[in-house]
Amino acid sequence: MKNKNSGYDLVIFGAKGDLSCRKLLPSLYQLEKKNKLCTHTRIIGVGRANWDKIIYTNVVYKSLIKFLNETIIESIWKKFSSRLEFCNLDINCLHNFKKLKQIIQQNNNIIINYLAMPPHTFGNICLGLESINLNLEPTRIIIEKPLGSSLKTSININNKIGKFFKEKQIFRIDHYLGKETIQNLLAFRFSNSLFYYNWNNKFIDHVQITVSETIGVEGRFNYFDTVGQIKDMVQNHLLQILTITTMSTPIDCHENSIRDEKVKILKSLRPFNINNIHKNVILGQYTSGIINQKKVKSYLDETNNQEYQMNKYTETFVSMKIYIDNDQWSGVPFYLRTGKRLPKKCSEIVIFFKTPPLNIFSKNYNTLSKNKLILSLQPNEAIKIYILNKKPKLTSQYKLDLITLDFNYSKFYKKIQLSDAYEKLLLESMKGIQSLFVRRDEVELAWKWIDSTLQCLHLKPRLPDLYPAGTWGPARSKTMINNDGYEWNE
């Protein structure tokens, strides 16, 4: 058993990949800057490149220059770079893993294996780690969602990993769970009686969850074209946001208490059928248009590869109306929306509260505006509450204005630099805390519901509705919510 107070060896498989360069290395540098890395912690890049420590250090430095968004501090870099090691290793050659063992044996650190590679490589990596006893506790393994492309493939991947690692060793990352606003949602809901007692179908009218992007497929067309927005975003992020928004009160803040409640929500999701699927699930695909005052191509023209024909059935946008069939949420519609090439980058949860049963201001207002709570996840983490307030006047006549109570994280906590989601998740993995990570049954229940939804779409196929880049998706998305008497929060 390794000493809990020792440092960590973070072994990154896929050391020169996009995830490592864009997210992991900048986050680790920030943890160094904040003095959060243990003294003896090392960062060991693994890849087939014929590199040594010096070459890898130069590669890391260039990556930080490109993705850090701030000037590298020489003293921090000196300390950070001293942690770097590189292991030239082909994961398809079992005997190559002895090279990694030689590096690992140099100290008494706890091992954290980060598989920043495609899921089809996980089996070979786990087999190699077992061959050098790097699958034994307290060793941990981090893997990125989405896992698989269906329930069947997800089970297959989880079985491969589960053959070598126990569930308490496996950390499945959904980076949205590392966002401050998502974590604060638990505190917001369960520590404030103002919302604790009103978070149900008696007081909440409907809920909207939007995750929008201005970018297109950004060179990921080989992956995205076979997956689409439902598998890439709804299964991966939106269902996690939905479960945290709607879960019942856990008995405590223990990781399994929280995840048990999320699982109950996933089990309560109402499935679609072939008769209502196209009424409640709207698919779209962007055509050419204007984003940030620049012309952009249509989805079908995204690739310059003449040998590859983009799929006209692949959705780049989806909106859906979901119901949760339990006592707390029965009858409350949840509108989910996510897409590419939309007008702005935005992730938010919008809670609309019911109006009072008796309108005493009916003489001047036939209907009252609904109170609205907006939890903004990105680009600016914030909480806004919209309430009605009397406008000051000399007369006794009531003029009501919709005013905003605004809380912005960065403005309120001026002296605290908000951490990137990956910083928090990496630090939690080092502590061995799994509450911000996804349990196996969560992943598989999400895939079960997604598979059922996709099966209905396949049984009643239709091409995605087209929408110009720079707009909020197909017209039918607005029609869907307008028919219920609501409008998208834009």
Swiss-Prot record:
<protein>
    <recommendedName>
        <fullName>Glucose-6-phosphate 1-dehydrogenase</fullName>
        <ecNumber>1.1.1.49</ecNumber>
    </recommendedName>
</protein>
<feature type="active site" description="Proton acceptor">
    <location>
        <position position="237"/>
    </location>
</feature>
<dbReference type="Pfam" id="PF02781">
    <property type="entry name" value="G6PD_C"/>
</dbReference>
<feature type="binding site">
    <location>
        <position position="232"/>
    </location>
    <ligand>
        <name>substrate</name>
    </ligand>
</feature>
<feature type="binding site">
    <location>
        <position position="340"/>
    </location>
    <ligand>
        <name>substrate</name>
    </ligand>
</feature>
<feature type="binding site">
    <location>
        <position position="179"/>
    </location>
    <ligand>
        <name>substrate</name>
    </ligand>
</feature>
<dbReference type="GO" id="GO:0006006">
    <property type="term" value="P:glucose metabolic process"/>
</dbReference>
<feature type="binding site">
    <location>
        <position position="145"/>
    </location>
    <ligand>
        <name>NADP(+)</name>
    </ligand>
</feature>
<dbReference type="GO" id="GO:0005829">
    <property type="term" value="C:cytosol"/>
</dbReference>
<feature type="binding site">
    <location>
        <begin position="90"/>
        <end position="91"/>
    </location>
    <ligand>
        <name>NADP(+)</name>
    </ligand>
</feature>
<dbReference type="GO" id="GO:0009051">
    <property type="term" value="P:pentose-phosphate shunt, oxidative branch"/>
</dbReference>
<keyword id="KW-0521">NADP</keyword>
<comment type="function">
    <text>Catalyzes the oxidation of glucose 6-phosphate to 6-phosphogluconolactone.</text>
</comment>
<keyword id="KW-0313">Glucose metabolism</keyword>
<feature type="binding site">
    <location>
        <position position="213"/>
    </location>
    <ligand>
        <name>substrate</name>
    </ligand>
</feature>
<comment type="pathway">
    <text>Carbohydrate degradation; pentose phosphate pathway; D-ribulose 5-phosphate from D-glucose 6-phosphate (oxidative stage): step 1/3.</text>
</comment>
<dbReference type="InterPro" id="IPR001282">
    <property type="entry name" value="G6P_DH"/>
</dbReference>
<dbReference type="InterPro" id="IPR036291">
    <property type="entry name" value="NAD(P)-bd_dom_sf"/>
</dbReference>
<dbReference type="InterPro" id="IPR022674">
    <property type="entry name" value="G6P_DH_NAD-bd"/>
</dbReference>
<comment type="similarity">
    <text>Belongs to the glucose-6-phosphate dehydrogenase family.</text>
</comment>
<dbReference type="InterPro" id="IPR022675">
    <property type="entry name" value="G6P_DH_C"/>
</dbReference>
<dbReference type="Pfam" id="PF00479">
    <property type="entry name" value="G6PD_N"/>
</dbReference>
<feature type="binding site">
    <location>
        <position position="345"/>
    </location>
    <ligand>
        <name>substrate</name>
    </ligand>
</feature>
<keyword id="KW-0560">Oxidoreductase</keyword>
<dbReference type="GO" id="GO:0004345">
    <property type="term" value="F:glucose-6-phosphate dehydrogenase activity"/>
</dbReference>
<feature type="binding site">
    <location>
        <position position="48"/>
    </location>
    <ligand>
        <name>NADP(+)</name>
    </ligand>
</feature>
<dbReference type="InterPro" id="IPR019796">
    <property type="entry name" value="G6P_DH_AS"/>
</dbReference>
<feature type="binding site">
    <location>
        <position position="175"/>
    </location>
    <ligand>
        <name>substrate</name>
    </ligand>
</feature>
<keyword id="KW-0119">Carbohydrate metabolism</keyword>
<dbReference type="GO" id="GO:0050661">
    <property type="term" value="F:NADP binding"/>
</dbReference>
